């Protein structure tokens, strides 16, 4: 046995940890670029809460709030230009995976020259970036736990990760208390993304003992708590009776949030596999929500690949009270149903005419995902799988 495990991220987990933002930021300078989406962090009051703490500590700040879902490389460049012009010492991200990923691109390009796409496709390398602090407001992408920033090139539709240790956050403030403003549909999609991260890392070719232990634990947490938490949030949003009592709700938020962060950590080392490799072209082409795309793709991929590593897939199936790995795809479909997620690509606007582009783009942005998948995958296999998903 031989492996290495390296993940230099300071995770600060706990209720109301966000109130310590100034203390976490102080070692990195006196001026921050705050990266958010257009409305959510402001409507929830979290942005004002963070700003008040920074003001009290005399840490200056400037706002960049132009990030949308499936963030673009061009948006990251706009943010980097602002960080440069304002002489910011650090970047603070407040938001979900799109915000954190874009903030990583901003922090990176604020100190590096050239075309960001050259770095994404490894034509150029650098291990420098502004210090990054993240406050995740959704529990799904796990971006707080790794050195990946997924960005889409608007000219080509290529959706691929910027990857380097420099964009691993210096501090990740993982506060379950700030998750509660998520609408039900957001919780469903990000929660399923977290589940896929852990499943793919656990079954990847580059899995190792540390990632196996973490990912298996995270899948256990999500199997127990994700659907009940979603049903509770949905009931409250619809003005119905609560599903969980206060103690159960606290435990559920902690568990799903923790599992999400673990998912980000394990993919930093063990990577993701074909499920993510096939979803990125889909959301690059149609701008669909990542977790919604995975809800269609992951069950089909699991059914196609499980027999290449039955021991691992059998272990996962048992978590969901299914007999063996051949039933894991069906277990995932039941979760998709319970989360009210989409079950086919047709409902997301795809047709047979899109399949050639999707297949080609897998080989542009996701050859590493194919190589990391335990089953041997061909171009014809990917075409067959996309057709099954329509």
Locate each region found by the language model.
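Glycine-rich phosphate/pyrophosphate-binding beta-alpha loops
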Residues: 140, 261-294, 368-369
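Active-site pocket-lining segment
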Residues: 287-346
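Short glycine/serine/threonine-rich phosphate/pyrophosphate-binding segments
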Residues: 18-21, 43-46, 73-74, 98-103, ...
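Carboxylate- and glycine-rich phosphate/diphosphate-binding segment that chelates Mg2+/Mn2+
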Residues: 148-270
